Amino acid sequence: AGAMEGIFSMEKWRSIAAGMSCLSMLFATGAVTASASDEITEIPEQSIVYWSMWEEDEPQADVIREAAEAYEEATGISVEIQWKGRGIRSLIEPALDAGEQIDLFDDDYQRMAQEHRDYLAELKGMADTVDYKKHIMPVLLEQVKNWGNGELLAMPYQPYITGVWYNKDLWEEAGLTEQDIPDTWEKLIRVCRKIKNSDSGLSAMTCDEEYVNLLYGYQLARYLGQEKVQQLIRNCTWSQIPQAKEAADDIRILFFAGYMSQSAPAQHPEGQDEVGDGEAVMVLQGSWVPNEVTEATGSDDSWGFFPWPAVKSGTDGTEGVMVGAQGFGVTKDSQMKQEAFDFAYSICTGETDMKMTDAVNSIPADTDNTQWPEVLADAVPYMKEMSKPYMWAAGLEADPDYKEQIQSELLKLTRLEETSDEFIENLSNMK
């Protein structure tokens, strides 16, 4: 019973208690007869249909399954889970358009509020009854409401911070110390050169194909600031902004000069796994990467972190950090909105949130849970010092209709199939 209380506070079930109270009143007034009460017990079991962004064999799924069992035990309402994996981003809208019954789903919280918004219910009323804003990182609440034009359309969970994650053992093997941790682009290049010239045989950096936008997005935002990156994309002024080419030159040099692994950009997750396999020292990724790499490679090396460095004469420095989360959303046509919200809330807060943190070494979503996993310890001070939250790819994906074209050109740039001039020219001609 104690464990159940930890997961489900009375406050969370206020709506259920209210429903039971109304039912008691109906019995008291004779509005429901004894025979009718017999029929009530025969009503078919209610259920919430939840489409999940996780695969059923992932550790997140284990935590969610346990939460679903606890929810059903507490309420009598089952949670029917369909494990869709990351492909949910393209599967969910056609399914809802076809009239499929889905009450709850999850995806990246920015994508939830921006791309899936027309399918989502506003959650503020339900959130206020449980004082939800007390449990959520202010920066995440501000971001998700901003994307929702003031509406709360998604409940962030499993927050992340994005920056350069490095294998501390390999860092030392290449002759580097804590004093070498770079805060400027020039110092990062110096570190890369030092690793390349060492006897270690290590690649300085690595990356996967789907994350090359992080490299260019961060570098461009360092020069311009995130807002101007979004303006550049909206107005398609690539050829008029010299920093756009400068950032492309910078990222291309990482590959051209041999600072990136020869296999980069690799097919995910082969690139990031090189850090665990003892082949590459650094990778620009989200805070899920230490856990993913450890699980995939069996490495027990320790991890360090630093923000993407500042550029000379740039607008933003290391105070600009890409942060985000996954997000639960309740569908606007659901007949089980309150129940779906209650179930999602039970995962985002309290004991289940800590179980998720422990299972995948992620940042706690509930601000009451203050203990970060040891593997992410180096990122804690930077999260606290962050004053400019960046969205995913620092604004490079601000226009959903345009992001695939940018990604395609970035792959050509990083595969050295085109020059920086050609990169800018091709992007200039795309709108």
Cite the ranges covered by each PLM segment:
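Hinge/lid segment of periplasmic solute-binding proteins
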Residues: 39-42, 108-163, 189, 304-306
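Extracytoplasmic/periplasmic substrate-recognition and gating elements
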Residues: 46, 69-74, 78, 97, ...
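Extracytoplasmic "Venus flytrap"/periplasmic binding protein-like
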Residues: 70-139, 173-175, 180, 274, ...
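A structural signal for short loop-to-beta-strand junctions that line the ligand-binding cleft
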Residues: 103, 130-171, 203, 315-320, ...
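Short, solvent-exposed loop/beta-turn-alpha elements that line the ligand-binding surface or hinge
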Residues: 124-139, 181, 205, 223-246, ...
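C-terminal capping/gating helix-and-loop segments adjacent to ligand/active sites or protein-protein/ligand interfaces
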Residues: 147, 322, 360-370, 374-431
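Extracytoplasmic/periplasmic solute-binding protein
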Residues: 149-157, 162, 172, 187-236
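Glycine-centered hinge/linker elements that transmit conformational signals in sensory
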Residues: 190-194, 233-264
